[in-house]
A protein has these predicted regions:
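Glycine-rich His-Gly loop
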Residues: 24-27, 53, 95, 120, ...
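Flexible "cap/lid" loop of the alpha/beta hydrolase fold
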Residues: 106, 113-159
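Conserved alpha/beta-hydrolase catalytic His-Asp/Glu region
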Residues: 150-205
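Catalytic active-site module of serine/aspartate enzymes centered on a nucleophile-bearing elbow/loop
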Residues: 251-286
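Active-site loop/oxyanion-hole signature of alpha/beta-hydrolase fold enzymes
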Residues: 40, 49-96, 107, 274
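Hydrolases whose catalytic domains are alpha/beta-hydrolase-1, hotdog thioesterase
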Residues: 100-104
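Conserved serine/cysteine hydrolase catalytic core
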Residues: 186-247
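Conserved HGGG/HGGXW glycine-rich cap/lid loop of the alpha/beta-hydrolase fold
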Residues: 5, 9-66, 80
Length: 286
């Protein structure tokens, strides 16, 4: 079992294929297995590396999730890239992993060949300075975004409380539906999805750790060629964050995947993989 020691933090990883390296960064409640549909396709042309972030299955899960911050995960990623002898990598990040990938690209621009942000949860872009005043301002500017963000916060708190009480299934029952405002018309995810979310339920607590104050002005500093993808049926806060990323990052390409939500890359695998490959192959020809 390949495990890399990132400054004392064990990170399990799997790789397939050869060529330019592509590193896949998963979100909360997930692990490296969430990327299997992408690894199967990308590895035909690229050295594709999917790893489990700190405390995600099958890593040691007994640590303090409050130290699984965006900043610490970005440094774990830097250590993994260096440890595998890589120089520049194509980064693909989803949700909390998308925030990590974007933050990494800002802090380690020399290591980011490109950036693919999949429903990246860079929520700090919604308000310049988090707090009551900013929340009220957001409510007046965009009520649906503010209310959906509040729904997500409530779902997060309810889920963390339930998981702490021993109910790991709460992550799938309470939190996942809240990502798309409890929509019931989304395509089915793989049968393995519920099991993955349940075994990683405890990791949701990492999203309650303080976020780095990454604003729109800072995001403009991303230099790597960037593809921003998101599901058309994502919750309003989620949709808005991806829109902002696509608008603010210089030269970013934007793709909205119809009929899908927060996990669009599992709900429409064919289109998601097609758009990722198109983006990467275009860079190969530049």
């Amino acid at each position: 079992m390949p495990v890399f020691d990132a400054n004392g933090i064990p990170l399990y990883y799997e790789e397939a294929g050869s060529g330019e390296p592509v590193v896949l960064v998963h979100g909360a409640l997930c692990d490296h297995t969430v990327w299997k549909p992408q690894v199967d396709v990308l590895s035909a042309k690229y050295r594709t590396i999917a790893y489990s972030r700190r405390y995600a299955h099958p890593n040691n899960r007994e640590g303090d999730l409050m130290d699984s911050t965006v900043q610490n995960n970005a440094e774990d990623l830097a250590a993994l890239i260096d440890g595998l002898g890589l120089e520049k990598v194509h980064l693909v990040g989803h949700s909390y992993g998308g925030f990590i990938a974007a933050f990494f690209a800002l802090k380690h621009p020399d290591k980011a060949r490109s950036l693919t942000l999949a429903n990246a949860a860079v929520v700090t872009m919604l308000v310049a300075r988090p707090g009551a005043t900013a929340s009220i301002s957001l409510l007046f500017r965009s009520p649906s975004v503010a209310l959906s963000a509040r729904n997500l916060i409530n779902a997060t708190n309810d889920t963390v409380k339930a998981v702490d009480g021993g109910d790991a299934t709460a992550a799938f029952r309470i939190f996942v539906p809240a990502l798309s405002n409890h929509r019931t018309d989304l395509p089915q995810k793989p049968p393995s999805f519920e099991a993955m979310v349940t075994r990683n339920a405890r990791t949701l607590r990492e999203t309650t750790a303080p976020f780095p104050p990454v604003t729109k002005s800072e995001v403009r500093g991303i230099k790597a060629p960037t593809l921003v993808l998101w599901g058309a049926l994502s919750a309003p806060w989620d949709y808005k964050v991806s829109q902002l990323l696509a608008q603010v990052i210089p030269g970013a390409r934007a793709v909205v995947v119809p009929g899908t939500g927060h996990f669009f890359f599992l709900e429409n695998v064919v289109m998601a993989n097609e758009k990722m490959l198109e983006f990467l192959e275009a860079l190969d020809h530049n």
